[in-house]
C-alpha cells in the first residue's frame, strides 16, 4: 500500500548495535524497507521531494542499545549531523519537553533528550514533522506552529498494547496534517 516503509532501531534492538553487518544483511533482504541509522532518504517525485532523516540514539537509559551519555559530545554530534533541510525527523526518543512524560506508575516529566531539543530549537530550518517513541507515557501529538510532534509509542509503561498506530496524510507544501487514525488520547 505504501511506496516506502522506513524504520529505525531503538533501545531494544541490540542486534543493530552489536551486529550491524548481520542486521543490514537481513534488512537488505526486504527490498521494500528502508532502515535509517544516522542517514537520510529522499522520497517523492520531481515535483515534491521530502527528506527523511532517522537516528536510533538516546540519552543513556539503563543498559539498553544505542545509549550515549545524556550531555555528552558524542550525542551532541549525532544531532549536529542532522541535515538542515530535513523535512521529517525520526528519532527513537523524544526531544526534551515534547511528549516525553512517562505514565503511571512513574509519572516522570522531561525524560527526552535536552541536546536534541537544543538542536531543534536552534536549527535554522526546523523539521516539519518529528516522530519518536521510547517514552511510552508520552504517546500523543502536538503542533507548535512549525513542527508536528508525534510520540507514536503503542505500549504503556507495563508493555501493554494500549495505543493505536498513527496514520495521517501530510501536505509538505502547506504543512497541514489530516488524521486518518490516531491514538485514543489525541
PLM features: residue spans?
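Residue-level preference for short coil/turn positions at secondary-structure junctions
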Residues: 1-2, 48, 82-85, 126, ...
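Conserved beta-sheet core of the metallophosphoesterase superfamily
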Residues: 3-7, 24, 96-176
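Conserved catalytic scaffold of divalent metal-dependent phosphoesterases
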Residues: 7-115, 154
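Residue-level detector of flexible, active-site-proximal loop/helix-junction positions
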Residues: 12, 42, 59, 137, ...
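Generic preference for hydrophobic/aromatic residues in regular secondary structure cores
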Residues: 32-33, 64-70, 141, 158-159, ...
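Short, well-ordered strand-loop elements centered on a beta-strand within folded domains, enriched
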Residues: 52, 148, 174-185
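Active-site regions of metal-assisted phosphoester/phosphodiester hydrolases
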Residues: 76-79, 88-92, 114, 163-170, ...
